[in-house]
């Protein structure tokens, strides 16, 4: 049963959680807000994790403010280093172990988790996923004084880290079981341009094989690939993908699919429970990018402040942080019928995805062609008007 005097409880202190807090505080200055987070609650921008080496930034330098700073600035309570273990949607309570906490409205903003590689070997402690600030700090400590990095995965995360770490002085080799980089995001011509750009700064690619085993080799590792090649490295970064965190929602009986299922009000199947960010599936869409969560934070803040507001997603291009070959992509919907039309000059690629009527449904730009983003954006339909 709802207790109207209980706080709005937000689980998660990433970009989604803290941006919602900022927007809600503008509209409801007196609303009691509690943020519960499993990490230390520092405010930082997750996309900056893949720029840290190029800018020579430590984890502390990437953090913009502490949990205490956020609590003071926005007049909220932050319970950091605290895990929610159970959600009782009927009683409007979350549990921190044995401790119950009542909520009037609950927001699930706990993001996505790194997919763990299933590989053999005895070097698990030398394989790192970098999905949050604490992960980044742990990797920097392990990689201090090291030179060779093996990156598993050639998608957005893997390629961004390869660019950043190479600029930061590492020798990077990328292994992925795909024909080209960004296999789910870019058409092949654009992907090949990015690969050439990264190879131009020293990144080495092994596309096609899987990493089957990572074994200790002195202070480093030896990685066996499925094609028989052996790669030596000091540390390994696993960047094979992210998936929305669903476990607590499933245990609470909240409907999930690829993400936590929500309508355009960002309400889940449970009364007074909402979701946004990387864990959310809104009208069938899981969008693991910053622009959608910013739109969601603004809409949900209005709803929580008493004005039900549906979220809308406009044209939301993704800028990939690979300075060796800049990329902007607005991928077509998965079910969009059409074909890629490509113009190319070296690593400068303009790929337009158009239907039979000639309507633009998506684009991918690399190199100097990224300058055409604004013009193409004007042609595109909104993702979710």
PLM region spans:
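Rossmann-like NAD(P)H-binding beta-loop-alpha module
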Residues: 138-186
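FAD-site-proximal beta/loop scaffold in flavoenzymes
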Residues: 123-144, 219-222, 229-302
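Mid-to-C-terminal Rossmann-like scaffold of FAD/NAD(P)H-dependent oxidoreductases
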Residues: 2-7, 13, 26, 279-373
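Glycine/serine-rich phosphate-binding loop and adjoining beta1-alpha1 elements at the start
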Residues: 80, 89-90, 95-141
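A Rossmann-like FAD-binding core segment of flavoenzymes
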Residues: 30-32, 77-95, 101, 168-262
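Glycine-rich Rossmann-fold phosphate-binding loop(s) that bind the pyrophosphate
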Residues: 12-15, 131, 153-155
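Beta1-alpha1 glycine-rich phosphate/pyrophosphate-binding loop at the start
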Residues: 2-76, 164-185
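Phosphate-coordination loops involved in phosphoryl transfer and adenosine-cofactor binding
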Residues: 5-7, 81, 145-148, 208
